[in-house]
Regions:
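DNA-recognition alpha helix
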Residues: 2-21
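Short, conserved catalytic/metal-binding motifs centered on acidic residues
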Residues: 3-6, 26, 31-34, 71-79, ...
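Short acidic, glycine/serine/threonine-rich loops at helix termini
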Residues: 18-21, 46, 82-88, 113-117, ...
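Active-site-proximal, Lys/Arg-enriched surface segment
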Residues: 21-103
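Alpha-helix capping and helix-loop boundary segments enriched in small/acidic/polar residues
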Residues: 24-25, 116-127, 147-154
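Electropositive, glycine- and tryptophan-enriched low-complexity nucleic-acid-binding patches
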Residues: 92-142
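Short, surface-exposed connector motifs at secondary-structure boundaries
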Residues: 139-146, 165-168
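Catalytic or ion-translocation cores adjacent to nucleophile or general acid/base/metal-coordination motifs
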Residues: 164-181
């Protein structure tokens, strides 16, 4: 399904320029070629690792050209509603739907530093380390004020103990509201 537009885009002049190479004068990749890339090339472990690291590498390039004065990392989960029998999709009682429950780490400019697609029935803070630790590692030696934000789901001792031990990071965390008085 991810390659639905490949045939139409394979003859698009702008897409052919973006792809480059033979595509400039001929067609860009067909649906079957795109499907092979997705299933045979992108799923190789080294390629998955490269794809996961790509947003950070891009942000690092921008940061070299335009240094930042402070770093704000914002960790948050979201809902991605699903339909049909998609692998990993599950009912989430909080969102009241069949979904995936991805977690994102954004920076102060709203750029996605890292993300992880998760099953729909996991808790909001599930696998926070997988997303946050590589981002913190990238910024460890950067000499700027660092702030971490997260909602109540991330107000867990393991997370803020790691922040205190690893790097000097301030962290206002939201607390769940109690019943209204």
């Amino acid at each position: 399904d991810d390659t639905n537009d490949a045939e139409r885009l394979s003859v698009d002049p702008v897409m052919r320029q973006v792809v480059g190479g033979r595509a400039v004068d001929h067609r860009a990749a067909s649906t079957s070629q795109m499907a092979r890339v997705e299933t045979e090339v992108l799923t190789q472990p080294q390629n998955l690792s490269a794809l996961i690291a790509l947003p950070g590498k891009w942000i690092d390039c921008v940061r070299l050209a335009k240094p930042i004065k402070k770093l704000i990392l914002d960790l948050d989960s979201s809902v991605s509603e699903t339909y049909g029998q998609q692998e990993g999709s599950a009912y989430n009682g909080y969102f009241r739907c069949e979904c995936y429950h991805p977690v994102f780490c954004f920076n102060q400019d709203g750029d996605v530093e890292a993300t992880l697609l998760r099953n729909g029935n996991v808790a909001s803070a599930h696998d926070w380390r997988v997303v946050l630790v590589p981002v913190i590692d990238r910024y460890r030696d950067l000499d700027v004020a660092k702030l971490f934000r997260g909602d109540a789901a991330f107000a867990i001792p393991e997370l803020y103990e790691m922040l205190e031990a690893e790097v000097p990071v301030r962290y206002p965390l939201a607390r769940e509201r109690g019943p209204a008085s």
